[in-house]
Amino acid sequence: MQQEEIIEGYYGASKGLKKSGIYAKLDFLQSATGLILALFMIAHMFLVSSILISDEAMYKVAKFFEGSLFLKAGEPAIVSVVAAGIILILVAHAFLALRKFPINYRQYKVFKTHKHLMKHGDTSLWFIQALTGFAMFFLASIHLFVMLTEPESIGPHGSSYRFVTQNFWLLYIFLLFAVELHGSIGLYRLAIKWGWFKNVSIQGLRKVKWAMSVFFIVLGLCTYGAYIKKGLENKENGIKTMQEAIEADGKFHKE
């Protein structure tokens, strides 16, 4: 290892005592990956909530993202590619964010004391973001792996079958709150950090943040209920396997 690299590793500065730019670059990458994931979360919620319109609407949305505009029957592998990309971004964002986590009990106690003494709203929001981010890394990874390996199962019958019969309802209720809280807090903190809305006060941004949280959680719960209802209907209609659920979705396809 070069002497300059050793100095930079210990002190965060180059040989000439110039502040290393690596930390700023890592911070930018963390912000960029977080923004991509937050925007994906917003788009994803609107897409899956299409089941609130109708089963056919949800099926058409699923097929659209399989490239049905260009391929007559759609290609589920396209969804797998997107899922793989999101997994990579999620992992990168998680590792970048870990730099700022308390790494031992002593650091955690320092943070807890600081949080208690400051009684600052944004410090509390960071703590919520850290907890939800930790949970989301594991919960979202399971969901994304299913999307990666079983993209053909996405549809009103297939997705609701996974909800009820495969018992994914338990994972999804925790994932819903983790994603919506983490994402809205993240966008709020990014807006302050990078000065995106300089004409809006911090109080105004907080109101927008809480409005986003409430809106997407309510939308998510309504969507969650719709998939549960559809999953129970699947059972009543005698759909016993995922393959049968996929075949039921196929009836929406128009030649």
UniProtKB/Swiss-Prot annotation:
Transmembrane segments: 33-53, 78-98, 126-146, 168-188, 208-228
Entry binding sites for heme b bD: 44, 143
Residues annotated to bind heme b bP: 93, 182
Cofactor binding mode and count: Binds 2 heme b molecules per subunit, called the proximal (bP) and distal (bD) hemes.
Any Pfam family matching the protein: Sdh_cyt
UniProt KW Metal-binding keyword: yes
Location, primary (coarse class): membrane
Record-level GO BP terms: tricarboxylic acid cycle
The UniProt record lists the keyword GTP-binding: no
Entry similarity comment: Belongs to the diheme cytochrome b FrdC family.
Subunit structure: Part of an enzyme complex containing three subunits: a flavoprotein (frdA), an iron-sulfur protein (frdB), and diheme cytochrome b (frdC).
Annotated function: The fumarate reductase enzyme complex is required for fumarate respiration. This subunit anchors the complex in the membrane and binds a diheme cytochrome b.
Name of the protein this chain belongs to: Fumarate reductase cytochrome b subunit
Species assigned in the record: Helicobacter pylori (strain ATCC 700392 / 26695)
